Amino acid sequence: MAKKGKKYLEAAKAVDPTKQYTPEEAVDLLKKIDFAKFDETVEVAYRLNVDPKQADQQIRGAVVLPNGTGKTAKVIVFAQGDQAKAAEDAGADIVGAEDLVQKIQDGWLDFDVAVATPPMMAQVGRLGRVLGPKGLMPNPKTGTVTMDTAKAVKDIKAGQVAYRVDKAGIIHAPIGKKSFDADKLLENFKAMNDIVLKARPASTKGIYIKSLALTATMAPGIKVNPSDF
């Protein structure tokens, strides 16, 4: 494990590890922990009472944050005909079909999100071994396999965040930048929290959110009380 720096350790002293903060307190505290020399990404981590090995508990989806993420994603679209033109008009960075599949097979991966129309998935499926492990494979659950390529591109450019529960039952998701006003971070936090709550599997019994933390790239985790939303 990497050794924590002196500034990080000093910042950690401001956080009470035994306390569950309200969302407002957590955001205010996080913004006060400011020693990084860049605009840090703010993230949330939900530890859920789910078993990702069960098909009905593999939580995955996407949400458009009301205030965006602070980053404009580079979007590629696998489409032809009208859907290709619609994607271009909506602001897609690169649109292609077989040529784009080949480009990725040749090693090009300079993009953040991939969208595909259903008819293109037979060809895009060949990229599974490359895109799958990187979380870049188009998927209907995240709205990235669709005939409405224009909406998909616009949503992603507007700050759509894809999320999925990992093998440990945790969802990690960005909700903005440290430079955001506190109220904007809170609005994004609430939007993410709402979507996680709506994704609760019917088969989950008892407590759903086991723990929740707010953090940033160079900041310690701050425990948040899920009941305070």
UniProtKB/Swiss-Prot annotation:
Record carries keyword Ribonucleoprotein: yes
Top-rank taxon, per record: Bacteria
Family annotation (PROSITE patterns): RIBOSOMAL_L1
Record Pfam families: Ribosomal_L1
Family annotation (SUPFAM superfamilies): Ribosomal protein L1
One BP annotation, GO: regulation of translation
GO molecular function, one term: rRNA binding
UniProtKB keywords: Repressor, Ribonucleoprotein, Ribosomal protein, RNA-binding, rRNA-binding, Translation regulation, tRNA-binding
Family membership noted in the UniProt record: Belongs to the universal ribosomal protein uL1 family.
NCBIfam families, sorted: rplA_bact
Subunit record text: Part of the 50S ribosomal subunit.
HAMAP family: Ribosomal_uL1_B
UniProt xrefs under PANTHER family: 54S RIBOSOMAL PROTEIN L1, MITOCHONDRIAL (PTHR36427), LARGE RIBOSOMAL SUBUNIT PROTEIN UL1M (PTHR36427:SF3)
Annotated protein name in UniProt: Large ribosomal subunit protein uL1
Native source organism of the sequence: Lacticaseibacillus paracasei (strain ATCC 334 / BCRC 17002 / CCUG 31169 / CIP 107868 / KCTC 3260 / NRRL B-441) (Lactobacillus paracasei)
Gene (UniProt): rplA
